[in-house]
Amino acid sequence: MAFAASTACCKPSALLAPRASSSSPPSQARLCRPSTSAAFHGLRAPASAFALAPAPRRRAASTGIVCGKVSKGSVPPNFTLKDQDGKTVSLSKFKGKPVVLYFYPADETPGCTKQACAFRDSYEKYKKAGAEVIGISGDDAASHKAFAKKYRLPFTLLSDEGNKVRKEWGVPSDLFGTLPGRQTYVLDKKGVVQYIYNNQFQPEKHIGETLKIIQNL
């Protein structure tokens, strides 16, 4: 009798019969599919950037200290770029004074505008500490000039078209590599990196974090 019951429970029809379901669950691809574009601090990434993309390496919630090719305690490579007035500027020009060098995604985007204006509003505190503030993005000199004029930015903006310096310094990207990272470096008078701060979601925090370091150098 036990054998008969076991055989009855293992009938092929019972194994192959599909379960009744009022609705089939959505596939993983559908769950991961965004709308036609995704806005992030004013920049847009195509939907294809998200479709079944592999998970990125985790960082500390895109905030805090993140080190790439340029690390704390190192002397970063020199570079020469054009500023908002079309003049060539080299990093070595600022040796002998502390420097706050911040990489940002793009001019005229919400997060970057907030960050630039926050640096502007605290600029006198940086100057009092003897420091220079320099912003770098992939925008051209004309874009920087318009951006600086519109928001009355008193500091230097450098054009890193092609992102050569960004790559050399190892500035990490966000949003599956589609969004340039927001990372700030504090260099002392000797050109040595004393602090690296990364925070894409809270651009204004870069000012408070770097001021604390500058005022104690």
UniProtKB/Swiss-Prot annotation:
Matching Gene3D superfamilies: Glutaredoxin (3.40.30.10)
EC number(s) reported in the record: 1.11.1.24
Keyword Transit peptide: yes
Cellular localization per UniProt: Plastid, Chloroplast thylakoid lumen
Catalytic activity: a hydroperoxide + [thioredoxin]-dithiol = an alcohol + [thioredoxin]-disulfide + H2O
KW Transit peptide (keyword) present: yes
Domain (Thioredoxin) ranges: 70-217
Gene Ontology, cellular component aspect: chloroplast thylakoid lumen; chloroplast thylakoid membrane; cytoplasm
GO biological process: cell redox homeostasis; cellular response to oxidative stress
UniProt-annotated catalytic positions: 112 (cysteine sulfenic acid (-soh) intermediate)
Family indicated by similarity: Belongs to the peroxiredoxin family. BCP/PrxQ subfamily.
UniProt miscellaneous comment: The active site is a conserved redox-active cysteine residue, the peroxidatic cysteine (C(P)), which makes the nucleophilic attack on the peroxide substrate. The peroxide oxidizes the C(P)-SH to cysteine sulfenic acid (C(P)-SOH), which then reacts with another cysteine residue, the resolving cysteine (C(R)), to form a disulfide bridge. The disulfide is subsequently reduced by an appropriate electron donor to complete the catalytic cycle. In this atypical 2-Cys peroxiredoxin, C(R) is present in the same subunit to form an intramolecular disulfide.
Biological role: Thiol-specific peroxidase that catalyzes the reduction of hydrogen peroxide and organic hydroperoxides to water and alcohols, respectively. Plays a role in cell protection against oxidative stress by detoxifying peroxides.
Protein name: Peroxiredoxin Q, chloroplastic
